[in-house]
From Swiss-Prot:
Residue stretches of biased makeup (Polar residues): 220-241
Keywords of the record: Hydrolase, Metal-binding, Nucleus, Protein phosphatase, Zinc, Zinc-finger
Full protein name: Putative RNA polymerase II subunit B1 CTD phosphatase RPAP2 homolog
Residue stretches spanning the membrane: none
Length: 726
């Protein structure tokens, strides 16, 4: 690379590619086009990759300029930096070594950090599929043909003039929202839009409603919400219903709102979204009510034969102390089953009458308000009924007008023991509330059931605790049950029934049968102490354990039990040098039955064998050094491996110390010295070395001999070997 002053005119006329655009941008950055103009450098991030930017930094540092393209400063001179400046720097505080070769490409630490951050933000590869117009605009921006300016990042199609208005530098995109179509004929340009327009832009307020099709319904609902008082019961709103009380001004202002549907959205954006959400919820609730009305009519036809719906009482609008009217309120009272049919029959009606505990008579203006509210409700119902094409039955006085579902009962309620009644039909609320006293017995039953539930949960928790302890292997079944606090009582009911059946069928000669042979045996799962009140000592397996008794095995018992489980017939045959035909003669060895080799199918035997090989390999070199053996360790390992191949590994390896593992290996070598490794016989007969090793493992000579008897049940003399069954 080298500094350039002009670009070839013929190259500019050719179609711009990504590679050529990257090269021209690199040359511009090399010449200092982005010096003191970081926005212009950020604009290059849309085209450059990480390696491309690294090349720019390297070339600028070779030209004795700061590697950061946005920095106009040159690199420090050799005298300022020092001729023998080290390449690496060791930080004693951070315990790290820093390479100063990269830092020499920049004039300061600030430029080093800024360049590293900018390079890390670039993608590893160049962009693919960039339009030629965008490439030309970007190249022109760096070469001075795109308007320049500090705000270079806006040159990719947008710009900003001094007064803040948008100036077209490339392609200008303008977002336009379609206005509401007016009445009459429109031109094709107005109906379709510009030829280069892009469809798909949806205003934010229409995203909530669901599209322009519901715009008229949304505007009507918004106008009704803003010009009327709507009280929505939160308990009924969750189930899709809302209790609404509308004033008399609703009908009068409805037409005004429909004439100017778009003027209402000229307010603040947050208020528009809030009002649209409220109106949309009301529209959906009313539509759901109309859709469910058809299902309710089928239920009403079945209920007409048994009950008829009476007309509701006229509403009473009380007057407050200050002379103003009181809003409509409703009182929900739980009644008996007899009143359920009346509520079910009137389920499809909007009843705006309320039970007001007052004696004042409503005025004529209040009656007029009620009539206007009912009239507007009819119009709303007709509007949504026509939308879903539901035919209305107007055959009787009770269902003379299209009605909506009452908001006093939740949709889908299946509680047949409750109903909704007006307070003025059953008297005062205080008198009706006395009916709840009869439910005291039910509350007592629920309390008993809760106690039983808690007891069952406690039992389940104890059983889970005992099962986890048993499955983990930390304790036996009896100990786990005892620790969990579970006491297993004998089944006295079944025992008594069994005794009665036995007494009826027994013979005269069987009177001397013991009690334990006649009934269900009561065997507790844990040891019984003398101070227990639940069982007698006679019912337990054994008496109280003596003082100082412990179930923990000693180190010798642990090693002896491990050898006892490992030895098989194949092991004895290998130790005595017998073939497979003589293995059946080793069925009884040393007065006990010697089992065959067992291998677990789940692969645990091989895992135990690999773990044992590790323990043997760790203990064998130390043992060879202490006993001064002249046999190579490799030969000892091979012979011990053949012996381990004949053993059964079913249980987990015991937890032994290194001295104890050395003693276990010594027992195996002592058994192999009889036939397989006769060179070890003089070493094994040295009592001083053997006793020293036994003392370190805390095992006596008698205990060692008992372990040898497991592998040499027929003795170690040659006469004993010759007398083996053949």
């Amino acid at each position: 690379m080298g500094p350039t002053t002009a670009t070839d005119t013929g190259a500019r006329m050719k179609p711009t590619t990504v590679a050529s655009a990257v090269h021209r941008v690199q040359m511009a950055l090399y010449d200092g086009a982005a010096a003191s103009r970081e926005p212009l450098l950020r604009a290059a991030a849309s085209l450059l990759s990480g390696p491309d930017y690294a090349d720019v930094v390297t070339e600028r540092s070779i030209a004795d300029a700061c590697g950061y393209p946005a920095c106009p400063n040159p690199l420090p001179s050799e005298d300022a930096r020092g001729k023998a400046a080290p390449r690496f720097r060791i930080s004693l505080r951070e315990h790290r070594v820093y390479d100063l070769e990269e830092a020499r490409k920049f004039c300061s630490e600030r430029c080093l950090v800024a360049s590293a951050a900018f390079g890390a933000s670039l993608p590893p590869d160049r962009p693919f599929g960039v339009s030629p117009d965008r490439l030309d605009a970007l190249v022109a921006l760096f070469e001075g043909g795109g308007g320049g300016g500090d705000d270079g990042g806006l040159a990719l199609g947008f710009g900003a003039s001094g007064d803040g208005k948008e100036v077209e530098e490339g392609r200008k995109v303008e977002i336009m929202e379609k206005e509401a179509a007016g009445t009459g004929e429109v031109t094709l340009q107005e109906w379709i839009g510009p030829s280069d327009a892009i469809e798909g832009y949806v205003p934010r307020r229409d995203r909530v409603v669901g599209g322009p099709k519901k715009e008229a319904k949304q505007n009507d609902a918004c106008s009704a919400e803003q010009s009327s008082n709507i009280n929505v019961d939160s308990r009924n709103a969750s189930s899709g219903e809302s209790g609404m009380v509308l004033t008399e001004n609703t009908k009068a202002k409805k037409k005004e709102a429909t004439k100017t549907p778009l003027k209402m959205f000229k307010q603040d954006e947050d208020n528009d979204m809030l009002s649209s959400c409220i109106s949309d919820s009301i529209v959906k609730q009313l539509e759901d009510v109309v859709l469910e009305e058809k299902k309710d009519k089928k239920k009403n036809k079945a209920a007409k034969g048994t009950s008829r719906v009476g007309k509701s009482k006229p509403a009473k609008r009380p007057v407050g102390r200050d002379g103003h009217e009181v809003d409509f309120t409703s009182t929900i009272i739980m009644g008996d089953r007899g009143s359920e049919m009346m509520d079910h029959g009137a389920l499809g009606q909007y009843n705006f009458s309320s039970s007001i505990l007052a004696n004042e008579q409503p005025s004529s203006s209040q009656y007029a308000a009620i009539d206007s509210v009912q009239a507007y409700t009819e119009e709303l119902d007709e509007l949504f009924s026509n939308a879903v094409n539901i035919a209305k039955d107007e055959t009787s006085d009770d269902s003379g007008r299209c009605t909506l579902r009452s908001s006093l009962k939740a949709v889908g309620s299946k509680n047949a023991g409750h109903s909704v009644k007006w307070a003025d039909e059953n008297g005062s609320v205080l008198e009706t509330s006395r009916a709840f006293v009869s439910h005291s017995s039910k509350s007592q039953e629920s309390m008993d059931s809760s106690v039983r539930r808690e007891s069952a949960e406690a039992c389940a928790a104890a059983l889970i605790e005992a099962a986890e302890a048993i499955s983990s292997g930390t304790s036996e079944v009896e100990d786990a049950v005892s620790k969990a606090g579970i006491i297993i009582l004998p089944d006295m009911v079944n025992q008594q029934q069994y005794n009665n059946d036995y007494d009826n069928d027994k013979d005269a000669g069987e009177n001397e049968i013991f009690e334990i042979d006649r009934g269900v045996v009561k065997w507790p799962k844990k040891t019984v102490l003398l101070d227990t009140d639940m069982f007698d000592v006679d019912d337990s397996w054994h008496d109280t354990p003596p003082e100082g008794f412990s179930l923990t095995l000693s180190s010798f018992a642990t090693m002896w039990a491990a050898l006892f489980g490992w030895v098989s017939r194949s092991s004895l045959a290998y130790v005595y040098g017998l073939d497979e035909s003589s293995m059946e003669d080793l069925l009884i060895a040393g007065g006990r039955e010697c089992p065959q080799k067992r291998v677990l199918n789940d692969g645990h035997s091989s895992e135990i064998r690999r773990a044992l090989d590790t323990c043997v390999c760790n203990a064998l070199p130390v043992l060879v050094s202490n006993l001064r053996m002249q046999i190579p360790v490799s030969k000892l390992e091979i012979t011990l491996g053949y012996l381990l191949d004949t053993m059964s590994f079913v249980d987990a390896l015991p937890s032994l110390r290194s001295r104890q593992w050395q003693l276990m290996v010594l027992v195996l070598l002592d058994a192999l010295s009889l036939h397989r490794l006769p060179a070890l016989a003089p070493i094994m007969s040295d009592s001083k070395l053997l006793q020293k090793l036994l003392n370190s493992a805390q095992v006596s000579r008698e205990e060692y001999d008992s372990m040898i008897d497991l592998l040499l049940p027929f003795g170690r003399s040659t006469q004993s070997q010759a007398s083996l069954p053949s």
